[in-house]
Amino acid sequence: LHSKASNKPGGWFTKLIGCPESFTEPKDIYKKLKERGMDYITITDHDTISGVLEIAHYPEVFISAEYTVFVPEEKTSIHVLVYGIDEHIHEDLMKLRDNVYEFVCYLKRKGIAHSLAHPLYAVNGGRVSLSLVERFVLLFDNWEGINGSRGERLVELEAKIAKAFSGWEKIAQLEEKYKMCALRERPEIAWTAGTDDHSGLYVGKTWTKANAKSKEEFLKEIKEGRTQVGTDKLGYERLLNTVGVCGYKFLVTKNKIPSQIETLCECMFKENNSLIGDFYLKSLFGLNCSGDSLFKEVLNRLPSITLQKLRNSFTPDALGLALIGLAAHFIPIVILSAQRRDEVQAKMIAKSLGINSNREFRLAYITDTYFDINGVARSSQTVRKVAERFNLPIDVIVVESCSVAINGEEKKLKVLHPILEFSTPYYQEFKLRIPSVISIAELLKDYTAVHVATPGPFGLLAFLVAKLFYLPVTTAFHTDIPSYAYLYTGSEDLKEFLYKALSLYHNLSEAVFVPSQTYARTLIERGVKPEKIRIFKRGIDTELFNPNKRERNYFQRTFGFTPRGRVVLYVGRVSKEKNLDVFVEVAKHFPGETFIIVGDGPYRAEVERNSPENVVFLGYLSGETLAKVYANSDIFFFPSETETYGFVVLEAMASGLPVLVSKKGGASEHIKDGVNGFLAEDLKEYIAKLSALLLDEELRKTFAKNSLSYVLSLDLEKTYLEYLNMLMGGQKSEIITSFFRFKREDAGYEASIIPSKGRELLSFNEMLQDAK
């Protein structure tokens, strides 16, 4: 617990600007502690007792301090809380701080109560190692079990680590290891607790209890380890609010705070907000919350408010305010990152001691596109459905505006709302949405691993936050963005820059999931490390897409036209990268056949303008209607050269269509040329191979049969479970907890997955071997 006497900066930034650690008056601390029912009171300022001396005349106050003490072998400093001292002892202790052994020996010799402060939290950017913790075990009988500015996770880890060293036998082993005598008086570590408050907001909200009728008895109980500890709710909001209060008071002392911001801070940091203050916050930020979350919610809304002002009036003042708002918005993330770093260090120590410190596995599946109509969105939707059906520890997290209606409560789906939304250059229909970074952090702090499916604004921000939180992150390459950029801009430099950026991005991940060998080779050629690459396949819904949906006169009854000749179908986005100019040119060579385009996009007007009359546009279709269009066509023609996988090719094959596909891109990997389809690479070859298909009905039937057999081997649930197994297995977690039952059916190889009882749980690969 700190007062204004802790007047030195605590970190590199506060040192840079000269901001002290606390501005709280000792008498205010005393008053609050009495109001909150504390029987005995002290203040533990850093390396000084000047603060507590201001209230030392009260009978329930005892003098204490938090000393920064050096550990020579570890070349690091630690903090030691010392209770019930006087000015002479303080002078002695200040002289002994350069050597922890001399410091603790003095305390033991004098019989002074003391406790090791925040054992698993590094001081001044140092590192807490296993050897340092083992020296703690040899030196200190009391540890600070709860530190009010740290999270609950660190409290749990500290208790587990301390328990691992219980007993004189363990202490003797460490004496032998470090060739030194322990200064311990008890075989078990006892606990103290403190708020570590620097702001005055949390005074008395974390405490140490003991059965005592005087402060002398209380100090004796601490010394002999007969204490209990307690706290109000912990959370990073405590430290965040402390930073806010200290920053605000520092600016006030420097007369550098605008009156509007001063009013805002007064409303936020008063413990009992007035009705006027509540109205002010609600009108300015739309806030109804109070307490610990208030400052966080203000920071959460700052970017959207300041950016809106900037859009309304682009002035230097508005720009400055927007930049300040964005910078302030990242304060909670910096604090959470620091706390997570301490947790990771503690977990490493626990692991080295054989302590299971892992949280229950939870994967956040991040995607910029979910409600849109594209392959990546459909894949994300299937991930959610499979995760729900098999109760996998996976949530799909998306960003969407309030205007999108979600049918019912979709399990395994979390939706963030954007603070900024804009159309993609060259593709106005596709929106890029940016949520607040705080909302991302609030979600990801509860997960143990992250998969970023898309490198859009949301995906990149989630990637950054996950890295700052020391979470394992995997990525995916679903879309050839550099090639798209080149097709639209003609800039080779932009294409090269984007490939370099993507290579850096993927190399920073644990693994990159690529849907085809073609693009795996491309990424490796562009600089992605080969050991990062994971190939994954996905099936499609063969109940929805199948040949049995062919109907007589379907196009006449549904769309009001009768195709002439045979139907050659394209399904997909109508955009430049899909190479639809080739589709149109081929159609011109077959005026007696009908060429249908299903889909929409930014290139539609251009394609329609250049199309002959035998090309028909049906727009966006989905579900049963799309499935019937597939089944009632005769040939599927897909000239796109930038497909990373080609879902629509699989849908066509499942619908019993022979397919003609570009040799370039990932979609070609589904085709064995001349067996279940044709591959082509230029206009002449497309025309020749399409002509062969149109003229030879038996060839079409053979291709269709072989296509269907191939697609049925890519069972939807089986392939997605295998994919999700890789995602989760990459994090060394418990993974699929259902069992597979395989059966052969006339239509091909089908997998069905059922829960099972009474058997050992297996991973997908183990289950597959077991079934074989």
Regions found by a protein language model. Give the residues of each.
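Nucleotide-activated donor-binding/catalytic signature segment of Leloir-type glycosyltransferases, i.e.
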Residues: 605-625
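Conserved acidic donor-binding segment of nucleotide-sugar-dependent glycosyltransferases
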Residues: 673-674, 678-684, 692-698
